[in-house]
């Protein structure tokens, strides 16, 4: 019973149309699910991913009318996006520049070439070299050539003021192992290969606590086999980890809990998947609602802005 890497990462935007343009027309991802926040149906929940919406490739956004994030610790502070090969960095540098996106020159970070940049709201992103990347589905309609397309998430970086309590949760509750560290980053590994399995932790005791807003990350979700869901439910209960209890999101089943610094974690199943209610070739083209919200479709659609 082990984590298979990341499932998705959910962040916050205050401008859904501009967000949609950036992640599809600049980063070249596919909008695989256009739905709403199930706890706040006036807000879009947009899922961008590879060509099939595979777990581990989704970066998702809640659309909330909020001010910008106040950066600090106790937060998820950077999201890695995997690409393959050094030549891809040359293409992406030119592509980002053409689209007016500022970026930093690539550097080696824990042995991988990494290029940092931000979206229009200050969402901190990095392109990360993953030479072994094969676990993604191409998106034929992407603005990005196949050989340079983003393969998925990883690594994802947390900022905490003290490592000890977070380390205990990552290793004793979630079964991660400390892979390596340098002066500023501690890298933890899940049961998969490459950056999709790595959670990085920065220890930054001098920073103030972050305040969420546009440009911040709301939570990170970890991938498990569907069959392991009952066991993970029992594990959190047995270890007395305060959690949400089972939550059915229709496209996957979830468990939510917070690590000791308040950072929200989710455990999410790899099935049923986004094709549960839409054909693969039509993913994300219309508003998709879980069955319990379908009776309110007209009301919900009337309250949403056009993308």
Give each language-model segment a name.
Residues 5-14, 32-35, 65-161, 186-200, 239-307, ...:
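Vicinal oxygen chelate
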Residues 12-55, 98, 106-116, 158-202, ...:
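Core segments of cupin and vicinal oxygen chelate
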Residues 25, 60-62, 93-96, 171-172, ...:
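Short amphipathic alpha-helices in soluble, non-transmembrane regions
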Residues 33-38, 48-81:
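Conserved donor-binding loop and adjoining core beta-sheet/short helix segment
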Residues 48-50, 63, 129, 203, ...:
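Residue-level signal for short segments within beta-strands and strand-turn junctions
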Residues 61-66, 138-142, 200-207:
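Short amphipathic beta-strand starts and helix->beta connectors
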Residues 147-243:
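Surface-exposed interaction/gating patches
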